[in-house]
């Protein structure tokens, strides 16, 4: 919530919050300047589960990518791309790392979204003057978004993880399935 409501507003990004379980409300919130539909696979703090397939259909109908935060869902429990998500993000600090030792994040691009079709994503579809006039959509095809992220945003913001922290996250992935199985087992007992 804080990222969307407070941090991103400092960069001119505004968010319209809706009830993800009311599909009409989701669709009615889309404005001409909307750039993406964003939701969590398991909502925080209620652990509610939205209809990802239906929301993906709404987003795609309007030429928008569906971005899913799968931090709590983890790749072990749900794979949002199989349900229509275009981009999946994870806070790797939580379940993927599993030990609270490392700050990190993951962006997974499905490669299925057409960045040129809607005309809303000139930074990816049009020639980029800061990168030798390359159109990432033309040059990288299905990998346009992640190529743009790597070539421009990482270059300009320096958002990268150290080799040791990457190692710690990889170690965490080795036990992800065991840890999530235990979480699920414990949850069933509580419920």
Regions found by a protein language model. Give the residues of each.
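Conserved PLP-enzyme active-site core in the AAT-like
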Residues: 1-191
């Amino acid at each position: 919530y804080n990222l969307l409501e407070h941090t991103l507003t400092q960069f001119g990004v505004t968010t319209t919050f809706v009830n993800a379980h009311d599909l009409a409300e989701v669709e009615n919130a889309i404005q001409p300047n909307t750039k993406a539909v964003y939701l969590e696979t398991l909502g925080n703090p209620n652990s509610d589960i939205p209809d990802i397939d239906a929301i993906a259909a709404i987003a795609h109908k309007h030429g928008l990518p569906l971005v899913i935060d799968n931090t709590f869902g983890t790749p072990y429990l749900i794979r949002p791309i199989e349900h229509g998500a275009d981009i999946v993000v994870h806070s790797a600090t939580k379940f993927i790392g599993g030990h609270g030792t490392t700050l990190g994040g993951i962006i997974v691009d499905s490669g299925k979204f057409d960045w040129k079709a809607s005309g809303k994503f000139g930074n990816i579809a049009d020639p980029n003057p800061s990168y030798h006039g390359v159109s990432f959509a033309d040059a990288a095809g299905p990998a346009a978004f992640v190529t743009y992220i790597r070539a421009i945003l990482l270059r300009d913001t320096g958002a990268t993880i150290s080799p040791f922290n990457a190692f710690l996250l990889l170690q965490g992935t080795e036990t992800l399935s065991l840890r999530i199985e235990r979480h699920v087992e414990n949850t069933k007992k509580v419920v």
